[in-house]
Amino acid sequence: MRFRGLDLNLLVALDALMTERKLTAAARRVKLSQPAMSAAIARLRTYFGDELFSMQGRELIPTPRAEALAPAVRDALLHIQLSVIAWDPINPAQSDRRFRIILSDFMTLVFFERVVERLAREAPGVSFELLPLDDDPYELLRRGDVDFLVLPDLFMSSAHPKAKLFAEALVCVGCPTNEQLLGELSFEKYMSMGHVAAQFGRALKPSFEQWLLLEHGFKRRVELVVPGFTLIPPLLPHTNRIAIIPLRLVKYFEQTIPLRIVKHPLPPLWFTEAVQWPALHNKDPGNIWMREILLQEASRSEFQGETSLE
């Protein structure tokens, strides 16, 4: 189909090229052969009167003109998809929808595995692609490249709708044989002890308690840094190190990795896990159905109310 001389299929190719930045991957994304994608680039260059891309090794480097076109092309394709194509009511038992979700290792273990178990029964054709925290998840959200972010509410964008899942307490833990934890844990002792800390994404975003300390000008003695909370419990036994991790994670590992919970000298540490979705997907029946599943699972009694420290 052409619109004012432009083959609209070329916009799909341009969007894939801007997303993947590699010729072969972009061709695979839109189910074209590599020669066909090369031909599409040539036609795009002719139509727009611009090179659009140059090659640097195997990577496609967009020109300023291509960078300027990309957001409008993506928005146009999303509007077509959501307004024309994706409005059929979803039938969970027959759906083969695939959802792309950014969430932490912690949420995968303590929450999302329940969602997967439920949908294996109710919607066996539905599949998921779980993604790590990216350098810029908000750009993926804006472009509609992910269906949901599941993150602490504090770190969510104000430009897209969101909903609370549950509140979570952060607790200080260490090895049960760590004699330094027998007495009161003063602020001075807390700061001087070796810590195992989680940082997230390629940019190593700090966890909530680390962000809180940095905001007040304090710096812990961090001896180990890991890319997620779930790697911390196995690294504490038989050491004198401590860590701040979600309470539900302590309970998840309590049968295999016993940990001692100690009262930390910081203000009470809580955060709210929430789910966010692209504004463009707000009325998409499939997105509405999946977010209802997430909210229903979060409303179960074990996820509501204050989490007991006992």
From Swiss-Prot:
InterPro entries: LysR-type_TF, LysR_subst-bd, NodD_PBP2, Tscrpt_reg_HTH_LysR, WH-like_DNA-bd_sf, WH_DNA-bd_sf. Keywords: Activator, DNA-binding, Nodulation, Plasmid, Repressor, Transcription, Transcription regulation. One of its GO terms (molecular function) is DNA-binding transcription factor activity. Residues 6-63 form the HTH lysR-type domain. It comes from the Bacteria. PROSITE patterns: HTH_LYSR. Coiled coil: none annotated. Pfam families: HTH_1, LysR_substrate. The keyword Ion transport does not apply. Residues 23-42 bind DNA. There are at least three nodD genes in R.meliloti. They differ in their specificity of interaction with different flavonoids and, consequently, contribute to the nodulation of various plant host species to different extents. NodD regulates the expression of the nodABCFE genes which encode other nodulation proteins. NodD is also a negative regulator of its own expression. Binds flavonoids as inducers. Belongs to the LysR transcriptional regulatory family. This is Nodulation protein D 2. It comes from Rhizobium meliloti (strain 1021).
